[in-house]
Amino acid sequence: MNAASRSDSMKGGGRATGGRGNDTQAIEAVLAELVDAWGRGDADAYGTVFTEDATYTSFLGTLYRGRADIVASHRALFGSVLKGTRLADDIVDIRFYGPDTAVVNSHGDTYKGKPKRLTKTQTYTMVRRDGRWLIAAFQNTKRNKLMERITYLSTPAARPAAER
């Protein structure tokens, strides 16, 4: 991944497939815009990286439908519980499904000061619209490390290959 095209809180070691370097860089740039907008607490700028009909599922399970809903909710959050936070997003991989669709997996979290352990896993479904990559769907899941450890101890084959 090209670290120069991302903010310093988007340090990834992921891999893209299929020799799609320009598309990979464009997707990384969109996610850097997302991180930057979050850091500024700018809900309007945050919303510009989503499609008009995007869906957004928070780690709490809340489902937001459409850019306007995503912007309104983040405006409220940036003014309250998320005020002054920053967003860390470490890209794990980018996979392409045709010329205009990609799925991005990442680890991330919100933080104040310096980022700590990234406790959430995200999946972004990206689409190219009018030559620009945008987020069409976002899913955020909080990892439960204790339950993962218990599962892996009792069922070692359940551990993801990347973590073996």
Each language-model region and where it sits:
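Second-shell loop/turn segments in exported
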Residues: G18, L60-G61
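Short, surface-exposed beta-strand-loop junctions and turns on beta-sheet-rich folds
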Residues: Y64, T110-Y111, T141-K142
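Well-ordered beta-strand positions in beta-sheet-rich domains
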Residues: L63, A88-I91, T119-T123
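Short, low-complexity N-terminal intrinsically disordered segments enriched in polar/charged residues
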Residues: M1-E52, L153-R164
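Short beta-strand edge/turn micro-motifs at domain boundaries
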Residues: N2-S9, T119-R149
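A mature extracytoplasmic/lumenal domain signature
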Residues: L60, H107-G108, Q139
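Surface-exposed, charged secondary-structure patches
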Residues: A26, T55, D69-K116, R164
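Hydrophobic pocket/interface hotspot
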Residues: L34, Y46-G47, A54, G66, ...
